């Protein structure tokens, strides 16, 4: 996996093209829930581990955070096997706290976004490929909705049931505001069906390419 990530980043200049010495680097995985370990609801820990290694080798100071739909970032990380890896690399796990930020759109200039994400020197977005009942598919843009902390996330999901277009526009504005320097999608095993939480694992590579 580490070698695959290095090959992926090599044409872009490697991790050092995105991370400079001393940069604070948010690693933003999908930490949806602690409730279904093994069902591919979250970004796989080994991806975050390898990316964190590359960040540290580039001189960055990685930290790890999300605003899960259910529970705390630390609780979801613990349930899904993250803690030993994070402890080995001495990477702090942070809970997100909201603050109002202006966005490029007057319609959504009241968005509350994670202070931790907005204050990071670098954001590395690490989403999971999953089906999504409301949006069909969740990947890079939708993962940044995890930077909307607390009760506002539930409110926006209810709004999606009323107006999917407006919800999608809000997601775009959130992504533009967070503006991640790098997105690496976990497609080792996706999730299909009743996603993003109730689906089943799905291998994305066909047999002839395995």
Model-inferred region functions:
Residues 1-208:
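N-terminal and secondary-structure boundary signal
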